[in-house]
C-alpha cells in the first residue's frame, strides 16, 4: 500500500529543553490501519497532536499526501482531510449532540468542501448507523455516559469522512460491548477507504487489527513490523521492552 503520511526524523516537545519525540520516523499506508504501541508516557499521543497541528515540531518533516504540513494550524488539517479522535472527549459538554455533530460539518461547508445537501445526507446516514444519535439528539453532550460520548465522537468522524483519522485510546474505560462497537466502526471506516493511525492500551487488539505496527519507547521508534512479525522473534523482544504479553 502507498504511504499517505510520513514522519521524517520528527523531534517535538512542549518545553524548549525537553524532547518528548526524538527523531521519530514512520509511515502510514493509505486505506489501512497503522498501529502505535508503547508504555504510558512514550509519546504516542504527542505524535498524534503533532500530526494534526496542536504541537509544532522542533525539527523534521511531516508529509501528508505529498505536502509538508508540519506546524499547520488544526483547522487547516481538518480541511485537508485529517481528523483526530482524542482519548478525552472533545465534545462541547453544554452543546447538544446535534450541535456537536453539525459544527464540523458547517466548517467544511464554509470551506467549500461540502454542499448543504451533502451535509444533510451524511447526518441522515449517521442517525441510521448510530442509534445513540436518535435517542440523545437533543441532550447536552455532557449528560451522556462515557460510552455514549465515544460513539458520538465516532459519529462525527463518520459524517466528516476524513482521509486520515487519528484515533487515540478508543476503548479505554469502555465496556466490552461498546469497545466492540467502536472497533466495528474502525473496521467500517477502513473498508470505506479511510486511513487510520491507531493507539490503544489493548496491545493485543492493536496487533490483531493493524496492518503494520510501530513500537514507541521514550519518544523513539524501537521496533516495527507486520502482525506476522510480532508472532516471531520480534514478539519476544517487544514483550521484554514493554513488560507485557499480547
Where in the sequence are the language-model features?
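Conserved ABC transporter NBD signature motif
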Residues: 60-69, 80, 118-123
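C-terminal boundary and immediately downstream tail of ABC-type ATPase nucleotide-binding domains
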Residues: 82, 88, 128, 215-218, ...
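ABC-type ATPase nucleotide-binding domains, specifically the catalytic core motifs of the NBD
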Residues: 15, 95-121, 129-131, 225
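Conserved ABC ATPase signature
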Residues: 140-144
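The feature captures the beta-strand-to-loop junction immediately N-terminal to the Walker
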Residues: 37-39
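ABC ATPase C-loop
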Residues: 157-158
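A short, flexible loop at the N-terminus of ABC-type nucleotide-binding domains that lies
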Residues: 1-4, 11-23, 30, 73-74
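Helix-to-loop junction immediately C-terminal to a conserved catalytic motif
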Residues: 52
Amino acid at each position: 500500500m502507498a504511504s499517505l503520511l510520513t514522519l521524517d526524523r520528527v523531534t517535538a516537545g512542549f518545553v524548549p529543553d525537553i524532547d518528548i519525540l526524538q527523531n521519530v520516523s514512520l509511515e502510514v499506508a493509505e486505506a489501512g490501519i497503522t498501529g502505535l504501541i508503547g508504555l504510558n508516557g512514550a509519546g504516542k499521543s504527542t505524535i498524534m497532536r503533532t500530526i494534526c497541528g496542536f504541537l509544532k515540531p522542533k525539527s523534521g518533516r511531516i508529509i501528508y499526501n505529498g505536502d509538508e504540513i508540519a506546524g499547520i494550524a488544526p483547522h487547516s488539517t481538518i480541511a485537508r482531510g485529517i481528523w483526530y479522535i482524542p482519548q478525552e472527549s472533545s465534545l462541547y459538554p453544554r452543546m447538544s449532540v446535534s450541535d456537536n455533530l453539525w459544527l464540523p460539518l458547517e466548517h467544511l461547508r464554509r470551506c467549500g468542501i461540502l454542499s448543504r445537501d451533502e451535509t444533510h445526507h451524511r447526518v441522515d446516514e449517521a442517525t441510521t448507523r448510530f442509534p445513540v444519535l436518535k435517542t440523545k439528539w437533543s441532550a447536552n453532550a455532557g449528560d451522556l455516559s462515557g460510552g455514549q460520548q465515544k460513539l458520538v465522537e465516532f459519529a462525527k468522524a463518520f459524517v466528516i469522512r476524513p482521509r486520515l483519522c487519528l484515533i487515540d485510546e478508543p476503548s479505554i474505560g469502555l465496556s466490552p460491548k461498546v469497545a466492540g462497537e467502536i472497533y466495528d466502526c474502525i473496521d467500517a471506516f477502513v473498508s470505506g477507504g479511510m486511513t487510520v493511525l491507531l493507539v490503544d492500551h489493548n496491545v493485543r487488539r492493536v496487533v490483531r487489527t493493524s496492518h503494520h505496527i510501530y513500537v514507541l519507547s521514550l519518544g523513539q521508534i524501537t521496533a516495527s513490523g507486520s502482525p506476522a512479525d510480532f508472532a516471531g522473534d520480534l514478539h519476544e523482544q517487544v514483550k521484554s521492552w514493554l513488560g507485557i504479553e499480547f
